[in-house]
A protein has these predicted regions:
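Conserved P-loop NTPase catalytic core
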Residues: 321-348, 354
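Flexible phosphate-sensing "switch/lid" loops adjacent to ATP/NTP-binding sites
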Residues: 1-293, 297-300, 317-320, 343-344, ...
Length: 471
């Protein structure tokens, strides 16, 4: 909305916890939520927009990334004690953006009234106080209990924090907003804060930050071609497959139960934040045996990043890079490659050309973000030829109808999707790849951003929001 009104806008979230991440043009890692926000604002994603990224690697531990660089693994208690030391990094990133952009829109994390976590807060009201920012408090009515959410949050805040709240917003409402009016009046009386609008539940298709459940698991294969993405426990960067979901020929299913696997036309093994644990899960759940049966039946399989590593012969972690302990596991054995984890993380934004049939000649753009090095056995055909800043190298592997590579975002280009359909899927069902034109994924995203902006603008008192910012 601010960008549509002519302002140069930057998103900002001091600390984000997510499995889906992105590599900027200068090789820094950041959360995808701020990438999507930057794209909506029409600006280049910048690691300053998300200076701290936490990538969960277990139920109690995360990889800590600061200014796009890995600092190491930390458990939750240790990070909570240590995070106050990162406030200078957060403020430096914010101040730099504030000097460069007309407006900086800050996203908090969770609830600002988690009183057990308020000490040394660097992401919610503590950050708002540090940068002297007004606050809009939004409640999700789709989850129920929105009046209690908003009233309880305001009541638990300190007086100096309550003074920062410029207004309340009800989000994701379904039905007749007039029925809410009595409750809104009472909420304003109880909190002393104006309700700036009720945003309806809008049918837009914008990448999820992490949760598959609300959007992706509902997709069923009622279309011509059945594509299965294996739903790994630590699945990451599932946005790799968003362009396939919007294609009229493809039904994309996310499957964790072998009973739901069926006989798909193509299987995608996605990235993961914990390759070793998810490889064990494949084995123990019966998914490995099921995938091997599908391979024997001629079903093509593509592994991306961690999925590529699992398709190989072995995965070794001699230094305990992933979980803090040395391990070596047998892979699925479908690609003649071996992976060894090291402490160094690869982060690049290369351009590439597919080398191996049936993808040969397809131009790819994407990014690499992974730990470990994969070595191909002698005579193995690499999948792509990469070039970045004048340096050239090969990546990935192919063996029969199994493919693997480290490159995320390979389906973002419509040319790649068309090649994918023509070369593999349509060969199985004899359906012309041109039966349904593939829209540019970027153009599709822009339409969704505009639809969301139009719906939110119509629902909110935008003038009051501008006034709260002194604009």
């Amino acid at each position: 909305i601010f960008a549509q009104d002519g302002y140069r806008v930057a998103p900002f979230k001091s600390q984000n916890m997510a499995l889906n991440s992105f590599v900027t043009r200068n090789g820094a890692e950041m959360g995808r939520a701020q990438v999507v926000q930057a794209q909506a604002a029409g600006v280049e994603p910048d690691v300053r927009m998300n200076p701290i990224l936490l990538k969960p690697s277990s139920d109690t531990g995360s990889q800590v990334i600061v200014h796009g660089e890995v600092w190491g693994q930390m458990d939750a208690a240790s990070y909570f004690r240590w995070k106050k030391n990162l406030l200078p990094d957060v403020l430096a990133a914010y101040d730099s953006l504030a000097e460069e952009y007309d407006l900086v829109v800050i996203e908090g994390a969770g609830s600002p009234a988690e009183i057990n976590l308020k000490a040394d807060d660097i992401v919610n009201m503590g950050l708002a106080r540090a940068v002297d920012a007004p606050v809009l408090l939004a409640g999700d009515i789709d989850r129920g209990g929105v009046f209690a959410q908003l009233y309880g949050t305001v009541a638990l805040l300190e007086e100096v924090e309550r003074a920062r709240i410029a207004g309340l917003i009800i989000n994701k409402f379904r039905g007749d907003a007039a029925l809410l009016r009595p409750g809104l009046v009472q909420l304003e009386q109880l909190t002393g804060k104006q309700v700036l609008g009720v945003v309806p539940y809008l049918p837009v298709d914008i990448d999820d930050e992490d949760s598959l459940a609300p959007r992706l698991s509902a997709r069923q294969t009622e279309k011509a071609l059945d594509v299965v993405v294996v739903r790994l426990p630590h699945l990451s960067n599932f946005t790799d497959f968003t362009p396939l979901e919007s294609h009229s020929l493809l039904g994309v299913r996310y499957v964790a139960d072998i009973r739901a696997l069926g006989l798909p036309d193509f299987v995608l093994l996605p990235g993961t934040k914990n390759t070793m644990d998810d490889l064990l899960w494949l084995r123990q759940s019966g998914m490995e045996a099921a995938l091997l049966r599908l391979h024997g039946a001629g079903v093509p399989i593509l592994g991306v990043c961690g999925g590529y590593q699992m398709l190989g012969e072995t995965v070794d972690d001699p230094e305990g890079t992933e979980s803090g302990r040395s391990r070596s596991l047998r892979g699925l054995g479908l690609l003649p490659v071996r992976t060894v984890f090291t402490g160094e993380k690869t982060r690049t934004r290369p351009a590439a050309v597919a080398l191996a049939e049936p993808f040969a000649g397809a131009r790819l753009e994407g990014y690499e973000i992974h730990m470990g090095r994969t070595v191909l056995s002698k005579g193995t055909v690499p999948l792509v030829y990469m070039e970045e800043e004048g340096e050239q190298r090969q990546d990935g592997a192919q063996s029969d109808h199994v493919y693997g590579c480290y490159m995320h975002g390979i389906f973002d280009m419509s040319e790649t999707v068309k090649t994918f359909l023509a070369a593999v899927l349509c060969a199985r069902r004899c359906i012309p790849a041109t039966a349904s034109p593939t829209i540019s994924h970027r153009a599709y995203e822009e339409r969704q951003f505009d639809a969301l902006a139009d719906g939110v603008r119509a629902a909110l008192d935008v003038d009051a929001i501008y006034q709260s910012m002194g604009v």
